Amino acid sequence: MKQKQLLSFLVCILMLSSCAAPTDSAHDSGLMLRVYFADAEEIRLLPLEDYVFGALAAEMPANYAPEALKCQAVAARTRAVAQSRAFGGNGCVRHPDCDICTDSACCQAYQTDAQLKARWGSEYAVLRARIDRAVRATDGLLLTSGGLPIEVLYHACSGGKTEDAAAVFASAKPYLVSVDSPGEEGYAGFRADTSFSCEEAAALLLRAFPGCGVTADTLSSAIRLQSTTASGRVATLLVGSQTVRGADFRKTLSLRSTYFTWEADGDRIVFHTVGYGHGVGLSQAGAQAMAADGADFAEILAHYYPGTQLTRMDKTGFSGS
């Protein structure tokens, strides 16, 4: 299966190379994506590099360092190509007649030019230029492993150490392993508190985990840490009588990460979180910190996706970069 997918990927690369128009434009890979726009509930065809622009602008703050923006551009492009049915991908899970959608909970966020104008206001021209430079500087670059685009995962802030994919998604990848991510303390949401009344938290937990038996009165003693991952995140907890995955607990209470502790505060319970997101793959805050220390985008990507290669998809074919 993998050999067939690899052959399909290489053939498509060669086809795109031969049919691409002779222009110096960065937005000219030749690949068109079928994109499902969740807000408009419609399908649109977009050139790959135009899609990368909108995905980068939606997924990472435009005022991040240029090298961090380049990392996100490569990540967005790799995700799109990996999913593209033209390259043997499976397309969008929720919209199988499309390559990718604009719902960040499913594929990747995306914003149109009109949305960016409304969001950025008077800073539109400056911020748009920053995004455009990152896309053009990485034009055609993908992250690959074994000759195929990798499964790209990223998040806002790891809290100082990324997570192994197997601990979150039960699917191990040699390039999605836990690595140190220093310098993230400057991220605005590095530490955060989320507070609930015990009654509210108990109701949410009972709805998600029927039969666990928690009540507002017993909540503080009914939640007990059972195990942690290698990076220090919550792997499993006991919620009343049930063992619950940290990721499921986080989703139930909309916590910022599985890197959390908790304490009772009268008739309330407070969760203290570190970092933001699932913690797997590229930490955007970590990329920003590494860029501030002088690392270029290739070094940053090699750190967060160890063992992968930067591979160029361009008019001359498919080759290591």
Language model features with spans:
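Conserved, single-site charged/polar hotspot
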Residues: 1-321
